C-alpha cells in the first residue's frame, strides 16, 4: 500500500480491543474526530445522523455507569440504535459457544461493545465476528477510558507531547491502557504501585520498548511521592476492581499512603491536574484534590461520550472531521 491521501487515517471495519494495536497517528485521529463531533454537536448544535440505520450490540458481564450511558446516548445521538444485554440475556461462552454468538451478532448488529471478565473472550469474538468488536473494559485493558483522558488533557494543556503522567495506585487495566499509548504521544510515565500490585510484566516490557522508540521515560516505583515528583497529571483509580471485592481488607492495607492529597500535589509540577475515571472512593483521593479547580474528573467523564462517538463513527463510517486538526 502507498501513502494514504493527505493524512486520511482509515479505521473503518477495525476492532478496538487494545491501544497496543493502534499507532499514535491512529489514536490522534480518533481524538481529532472526538473534538470535531463535540464542536459540531455541542457548540454549534448540529444534528449529525452519521449512524442512521445502524445497530450496536452492547454485552455487559459487569455493571457500568459511564460506559453504558456514554455509549447508549452517544450512539442514539448519531441516529443509531443501541441494544443493551446483561448476563441475564446473554452469557458469553455459557449458553452457546463464543463462535456461535459472534456469528449471530454479526448478522444482526453493525458493531458490538463488550464489557467482559476475560480479554481472551474479546479476542475470540473479534476473530469469529465479521463486524467491529470494541472493548468496553476487560481484566487487562480499558482503552475507551484512556481516549477520554487524552482528549481532556489536550483540551486543558493544548497539547500532549512532553507531559509527564504520574500514576499512583493499582497496576490495573486503566494503567495498562495508558502504558500502551502514552509514549506514542511523547508523554512520560511515572508509576507507583504497592509491592505485589505492579502492572503486568509483559505490558511493562512493551511500554519500555515504546518509550525507547519515542524518546520518552517510563519508571516504576513503590513510592507514591517519587512517581508524583514533577508530574503534570496525577492519576489514580479504584483500588478494588470489579470481581476483587473479597480482597478489600488486604488491598486497603496494601494501599496505605497511596491517597492523593495536596501533599502529593506539592511535589508535582506547578500546572498539575488530576484525573480519575470514577467511581471514586475518598480513600483514593481526598475531597480537597478531587473537588479542586485542578481536578478534571467531570470534563473527563463527559468526554467518555464524545470519544466513544468518535470510535463508532471511525469504525462504521467514511466521515472525515471538518474541524482543523488539534495540536497533540
UniProtKB/Swiss-Prot annotation:
| A cellular component term, taken from the record's GO annotations | mitochondrial matrix
Q: List-wise, which residues carry Phosphoserine?
A: 107
Q: Where in the cell is it found?
A: Mitochondrion matrix
Q: Which residues form the active site?
A: 277
Extract the SUPFAM superfamilies matched here.
Aspartate/ornithine carbamoyltransferase (SSF53671)
Binding locations of carbamoyl phosphate: 64-68, 115, 142, 304
Q: What protein name does the entry list?
A: Ornithine transcarbamylase, mitochondrial
Q: Which species is the source of this protein?
A: Sus scrofa
- Gene name in the database record: OTC
Amino acid at each position: 500500500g502507498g501513502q494514504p491521501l493527505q493524512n486520511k487515517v482509515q479505521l473503518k471495519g477495525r476492532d478496538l480491543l487494545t491501544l497496543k494495536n493502534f499507532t499514535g497517528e491512529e489514536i490522534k485521529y480518533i481524538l481529532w474526530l472526538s473534538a470535531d463531533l463535540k464542536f459540531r454537536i455541542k457548540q454549534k448544535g448540529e444534528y449529525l445522523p452519521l449512524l442512521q440505520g445502524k445497530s450496536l450490540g452492547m454485552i455487559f458481564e459487569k455493571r457500568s455507569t459511564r460506559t453504558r450511558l456514554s455509549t447508549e446516548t452517544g450512539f442514539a445521538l448519531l441516529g443509531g440504535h443501541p441494544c443493551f444485554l446483561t448476563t441475564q440475556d446473554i452469557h458469553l461462552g455459557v449458553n452457546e459457544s463464543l463462535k456461535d454468538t459472534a456469528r449471530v451478532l454479526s448478522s444482526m448488529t453493525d458493531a458490538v461493545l463488550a464489557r467482559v471478565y476475560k480479554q481472551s473472550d474479546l479476542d475470540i469474538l473479534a476473530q469469529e465476528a465479521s463486524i467491529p468488536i470494541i472493548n468496553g473494559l476487560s481484566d487487562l485493558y480499558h482503552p475507551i477510558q484512556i481516549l477520554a483522558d487524552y482528549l481532556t488533557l489536550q483540551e486543558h494543556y493544548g497539547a500532549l507531547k512532553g507531559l509527564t503522567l504520574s500514576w499512583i495506585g493499582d497496576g490495573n487495566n486503566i494503567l495498562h491502557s495508558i502504558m500502551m499509548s502514552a509514549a506514542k504521544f511523547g508523554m512520560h510515565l511515572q508509576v507507583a504501585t504497592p509491592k505485589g500490585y505492579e502492572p503486568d510484566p509483559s505490558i511493562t516490557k512493551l511500554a519500555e520498548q515504546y518509550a525507547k522508540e519515542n524518546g520518552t521515560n517510563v519508571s516504576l516505583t513503590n513510592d507514591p511521592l517519587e512517581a508524583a515528583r514533577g508530574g503534570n497529571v496525577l492519576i489514580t483509580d479504584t483500588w478494588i476492581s470489579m470481581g476483587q471485592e473479597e480482597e478489600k481488607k488486604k488491598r486497603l492495607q496494601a494501599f496505605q499512603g497511596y491517597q492523593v492529597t495536596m501533599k502529593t500535589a506539592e511535589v508535582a509540577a506547578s500546572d498539575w491536574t488530576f484525573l480519575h475515571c470514577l467511581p471514586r472512593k475518598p480513600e483514593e483521593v481526598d475531597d480537597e484534590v478531587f473537588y479542586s479547580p485542578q481536578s478534571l474528573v467531570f470534563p473527563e467523564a463527559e468526554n467518555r461520550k464524545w470519544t466513544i462517538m468518535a470510535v463508532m463513527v471511525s469504525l462504521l463510517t467514511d466521515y472525515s472531521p471538518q474541524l482543523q486538526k488539534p495540536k497533540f
